[in-house]
C-alpha cells in the first residue's frame, strides 16, 4: 500500500523565518515594566521636512501651542546641544504604512512617542557595522557618537560623546530603516547592525 502525498507549495514572507532569529528592530523599545511609564509623546514639528520613524535622535521644545496635554513639539536633533531623547515605534498609532513604504512613518502634527535622556530606556538604534564589531564584548560605558545626518551610531572621535550606555550589539541580523529621500519611501533592511543603547 502507498499513500500519495501532494503537499502544498508554501512560501514565507521575506524575513519572517530564518535559521538565525536573534536580532532587534530599530526604534522598538525593549519592554521594561519600570521604564515603560517614562514613554512620552508630542506632535511632530511643522517645520520638519522629513517624516519621523523610530530610533531617531530628537529635540523636544516646551508646549506653547495653547493645546494643553499634547506635549512639546518634536523635531530631529541636529547636534549634541539640542539632543533630548530618541523616538520609538512603541504606541505609534496611526503612522502611515504602504506596500512601497512598509516602515511606519509620521507626518507633521502626528504624535511622536519618545523617551527622554535619563529615562534608562533601552532602545535599539542603527549602528555603523565597523563600530558594532568593535563594541562587541566591550564595556558598556564605551564612548560613542551620533551621526545626526544619517541617524546612526558612529565611533567617537572628538567633542562630546553621546550620553548613553551600549548594553548590547547585534551585527548583521537586525531590521533597520532605509529612507529614500527621492521617493519618500522607508523600507526595512533585514541585515542591519544595531546597538541597544540605554539613554
What do these predicted ranges mean?
Residues 1-199:
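Surface-exposed, low-hydrophobicity beta-strand/loop segments enriched in small/polar/acidic residues
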Amino acid at each position: 500500500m502507498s499513500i500519495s502525498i501532494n503537499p502544498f507549495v508554501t512560501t514565507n514572507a521575506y524575513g519572517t523565518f530564518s535559521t538565525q532569529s536573534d536580532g532587534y528592530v530599530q526604534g522598538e523599545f525593549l519592554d521594561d515594566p519600570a521604564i515603560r511609564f517614562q514613554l512620552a509623546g508630542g506632535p511632530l514639528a511643522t517645520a520638519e521636512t522629513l517624516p519621523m520613524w523610530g530610533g531617531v535622535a530628537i529635540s523636544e521644545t516646551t508646549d506653547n501651542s495653547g493645546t494643553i496635554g499634547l506635549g512639546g513639539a518634536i523635531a530631529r536633533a541636529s547636534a549634541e546641544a539640542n539632543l533630548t531623547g530618541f523616538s520609538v515605534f512603541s504606541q505609534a498609532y496611526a503612522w502611515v504604512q504602504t506596500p512601497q513604504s512598509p516602515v511606519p512613518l509620521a507626518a507633521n502634527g502626528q504624535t511622536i512617542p519618545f523617551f527622554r535622556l535619563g529615562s534608562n530606556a533601552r532602545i535599539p538604534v542603527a549602528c555603523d557595522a565597523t563600530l558594532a564589531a568593535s563594541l562587541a564584548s566591550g564595556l558598556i560605558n564605551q564612548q560613542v557618537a551620533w551621526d545626526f545626518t544619517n541617524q546612526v551610531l558612529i565611533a567617537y572621535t572628538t567633542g562630546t560623546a553621546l550620553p548613553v550606555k551600549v548594553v548590547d550589539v547585534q551585527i548583521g541580523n537586525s531590521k533597520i530603516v532605509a529612507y529614500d529621500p527621492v521617493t519618500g519611501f522607508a523600507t526595512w533592511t533585514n541585515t542591519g547592525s544595531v546597538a541597544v543603547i540605554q539613554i
